[in-house]
A protein has these predicted regions:
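Residue-level signal for the nucleotide or nucleotide-sugar donor/cofactor binding architecture
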Residues: 8, 73, 104, 112, ...
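C-terminal "lid/loop" region of Rossmann-like NAD(P)-dependent oxidoreductases
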Residues: 259-263, 272-278, 286-304, 344-356
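Residues in well-ordered alpha-helical elements
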Residues: 75-76, 88, 100, 107, ...
Length: 357
């Protein structure tokens, strides 16, 4: 199959069986809709959605896929679920994704992000049709030295807090499984993907910047911010998802040539401080939106994080399409449409279509 480099190819995905963990989460719901729009046969395995409202429910994501509620920490259930489906492609996104939550719940964070990954990969070993595995970690998996040149894929794993550390551990698990069990000609090809702070319509999670901003705007309250100078690699959710899909395509077609770690982050100019994000969203929202500073002492969060994505650009021909200003306007527009009662399934598919074209 001749594919154009750097393009998510809908004819490749048509009728491919894709097993997706974490499909009820924010990124998982967007990816489920994108796969459905290309006529992939999708089975999701995840906990119940973790907020009310949530994108999975509001955009009727479960209508065009098989959806199983389960915990990746349950080896028997995840193994049976995956084996019964016998996928062509596996994308592992299920995780405990929050830094501050990980301080309160370190055991749950490690058991989900480390042993959960072991369980998913262990289950994958038994699937005879499986050719391509993409396991998602985070930009926070790197040992954060505060360098501002951008972390490269070969930089050391680390993590100051339990969440970041658990994702560094997951990367070590993926690397060991790749070399031990997924390196023969007859096995699936396994890669990891590391992305930054994803943003987009339909994120209602606790303790995340954009949802916190939108909740305050809705109530006409000022947004209270703890680290206005904190810089993050912000990117629209469809940017890394396009990277995951491109990577999965290449693993399926070209095998071990692409079986390694990959960074998917925004352009340098989109690594902006929190205060800049707030100012843009205040303008887009209108209606007297505002923000103020939280003076309480807060747990440590890494002050500077940036990814070097030149490898993905050179070898996968993946590059970000939307700048941050555009993305923030789209998020405000998405949320205001939601408040007006617009059909959010159609709204998401329209956004995916706009991204592709």
């Amino acid at each position: 199959m001749g594919l154009t480099k750097g393009q998510v190819n809908s004819s490749f995905w048509k009728n491919k069986k894709v097993f997706l963990t974490g499909h009820t989460g924010f990124k998982g719901a967007w990816l489920s809709l994108w796969l459905q729009s290309m006529d992939a046969i999708v089975k999701g395995y995840s906990l119940e959605p973790n907020s009310t409202p949530n994108l999975f429910t509001e955009a009727c994501v479960g209508n065009n896929m098989e959806s199983e509620i389960g915990d990746i920490r349950d080896l028997n259930q995840i193994s049976k679920s995956m084996l019964d489906f016998n996928p062509d492609v596996l994308i592992h996104m299920a995780a405990q994704p929050l830094v501050r939550y990980s301080y309160k719940n370190p055991i749950e964070t490690y058991s989900t992000n480390v042993m959960g990954t072991v369980n998913v990969l262990e289950s994958a070993r038994k699937c005879s049709n499986l050719k391509s595995i993409v396991s998602i970690t985070t930009d926070k998996c790197y040992e954060n030295t505060g360098v501002n040149t951008g972390y490269k894929e070969y930089d050391p794993m680390g993590g100051h807090d339990p969440y970041s550390s658990s994702k560094g551990c997951a990367e070590l698990v993926i690397s060991a499984y790749r070399r031990s069990f997924f390196s023969s000609k007859h096995s699936a090809s396994l890669a990891s993907a590391r992305a930054g702070n994803v943003i987009g319509g339909g994120d209602w999670a606790d303790d995340r910047l954009i949802p916190d901003i939108l909740r305050a705007f809705e109530k006409s309250e000022p947004v209270v911010i703890r680290n206005p100078l904190s810089t993050r690699p912000w990117q629209h959710v469809l940017e890394p998802l396009s990277g995951y899909l491109l990577l999965a395509q290449e693993l399926f077609l070209n095998g071990d040539e692409f079986a390694e770690g990959w960074n998917f982050g925004p352009k340098d100019e989109d690594c902006k401080p929190v205060s800049w994000i707030l100012d843009q969203m205040v303008i887009s929202w209108g209606n007297n939106a505002s923000w103020s500073l939280d003076k309480n002492n807060n747990p440590h969060e890494a002050g500077f994080l940036k990814l070097d994505c030149s490898k993905a650009s050179n070898r996968l021909k993946w590059d970000p399409k939307w700048n941050l200003q555009e993305s923030l306007k789209m998020i405000v527009n998405w949320h205001q449409n939601y408040l007006k009662g617009v059909n959010m399934n159609k709204e998401c598919l329209k956004e995916i279509n706009k991204y592709i074209n």
